[in-house]
């Protein structure tokens, strides 16, 4: 059985990473693709778990060798998704989440046309500013850069299949789970999962 590809995008500070983390903790057969990046690790980040940290030269070489499903430059740092890794997980029947920006999302959609695209929005710019400041990961200069680009990022929601407003974490998480569950009940997925059962039902045979 082939897994589904879910692309989740949001402006920085919207709560995407926290939602995905909780979703993974409560959902079976679901994983998140670990991106490659040239940025420096933040406190507490582990190489190979949060990101595959690399340098610019190695990243550029990987681009030239077409190793990335998508890649983009964000605030002076490069980010990319390994195509080989994603395809291997999907072929193993695992649903895969890509946490990437809207540029990368549109790149991936051209290759995986069945990918399910989800955009998460904050309830307001004021809330977004507060969340960016509270998490204490970036300087005020970086926060202002992120806010300046947030409106343009959020305007891309029209290119996505689903939109979630993260005003209440629990409500947003429930809505995110609902999208995953609904996809797993589609005709294509159920035919793959229950092929033998359906065959037996339609042939009037009893499975011993």
Curated annotation (Swiss-Prot):
Q: What is its EC number?
A: 2.7.4.8
* Classification via Gene3D superfamilies: Guanylate Kinase phosphate binding domain, P-loop containing nucleotide triphosphate hydrolases
Signal peptide bounds:
none
Q: Which residues bind ATP?
A: 10-17
Please state every residue range assigned to the domain named Guanylate kinase-like.
3-181
Where does this chain mainly localize?
A: cytoplasm
Q: Which GO terms describe its molecular function?
A: ATP binding; guanylate kinase activity
Q: Which keywords does this Swiss-Prot/TrEMBL entry list? A: ATP-binding, Cytoplasm, Kinase, Nucleotide-binding, Transferase
Transferase found in the keyword field: yes
Localization per record: Cytoplasm
| Gene Ontology terms: cellular component | cytosol
Read off the Pfam families from this record. Guanylate_kin
Q: Which reaction does it catalyse?
A: GMP + ATP = GDP + ADP
Entry-linked NCBIfam families: guanyl_kin (TIGR03263)
Q: What is the role of the protein in this entry?
A: Essential for recycling GMP and indirectly, cGMP.
The UniProt family comment states:
Belongs to the guanylate kinase family.
Protein name as it appears in the record: Guanylate kinase
This protein's gene is called: gmk
């Amino acid at each position: 059985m082939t897994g589904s590809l879910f692309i989740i995008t949001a402006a920085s500070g919207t709560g995407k990473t926290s939602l995905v983390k909780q979703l993974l903790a409560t959902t079976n057969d679901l994983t998140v693709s670990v991106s490659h990046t040239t940025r420096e690790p933040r406190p507490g980040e582990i190489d190979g778990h949060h990101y595959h940290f690399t340098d610019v030269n190695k990243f550029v070489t990987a681009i030239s060798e077409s190793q990335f499903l998508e890649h983009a430059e964000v605030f002076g740092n490069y980010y990319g998704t390994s195509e080989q890794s994603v395809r291997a997980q999907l072929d193993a029947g695992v649903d895969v989440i890509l946490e990437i920006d809207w540029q990368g999302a549109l790149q991936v959609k051209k290759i995986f046309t069945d990918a399910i695209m989800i955009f998460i929005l904050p309830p307001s710019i004021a809330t977004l500013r507060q969340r960016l400041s509270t998490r204490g990961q970036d300087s005020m200069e970086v926060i202002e850069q992120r806010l300046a680009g947030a409106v343009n990022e959020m305007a891309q929601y029209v290119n996505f299949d689903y939109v979630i407003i993260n005003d209440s974490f629990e409500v947003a998480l429930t809505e995110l789970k609902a999208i995953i569950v609904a996809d797993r009940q589609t005709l294509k997925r159920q035919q793959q999962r229950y092929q033998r059962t359906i065959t037996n039902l339609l042939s009037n045979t009893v499975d011993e």
